[in-house]
Amino acid sequence: MNNPNIYQLAVTGVQKLIPYKAGKPIEELERELGLTQIIKLASNENPLGPGKQAIAAIQKALPELALYPDGSGFHLKQALATKYALDASQITLGNGSNELLELVARAFLTPELEVVFSQHAFAVYPLVTQAVGATAVVVPAKEYGHDLAGMVQAVTAKTRLVFIANPNNPTGTLLAQAELEQFIGALPDNVICVLDEAYFEFVSQSAAINSIDWLKKFPNLIITRTFSKAYGLAGLRVGYSLSC
């Protein structure tokens, strides 16, 4: 074949991908629109920015930028393990929680398998599903949130992953502990529930769910979290997952 189109050499799922449209940087909007005072809400970035201790730690690390980082993230894993009373082996770090969603898809999906998630769910779920050639099964939303009964019914012998964001992104709906725990318990052992908790820090104390306790009960549960939102560190791209 002479002069092949390089895109035709990519796997089918990648060929059909529509790029994820992230919120535009303020500087880009200023150039496009000729404006100088823009308040950006598109990406749910923390308007307060990172904490003083985080800024101090970043400044302290600047002289080491010429060195490759610790690929295992030893110190961060140890800190998270201490915070959540887990073993460091239960923690996986990622380039934001987005990368962890991609890694889960690559690790567990093949073209003949299916992924279940809700309508109005995080836009990355269909992208990571399509990239590996798996089939997305989208369950109609219930009052802009998850129809858990409908999602259980959508599970078939081909289902390998279920994505749930709680609170949901972008609609903000919240599932209660009892109903979510019952849902995970209803899944077959060979169906992995990925619980995306990017916004869990914003839930009121009275409505908060201690999902980490479920790791002892559900070996098919993976929890993803991020430092991008509540901690104001979106620019550093630091996410992590918790599993059994």
Where do the model's predicted regions map?
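Short acidic capping loops at alpha-helix termini that bridge into adjacent secondary structure
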Residues: Q37, D87-I91, P111-E114, K158, ...
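PLP-dependent aminotransferase-like
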Residues: A107-I164
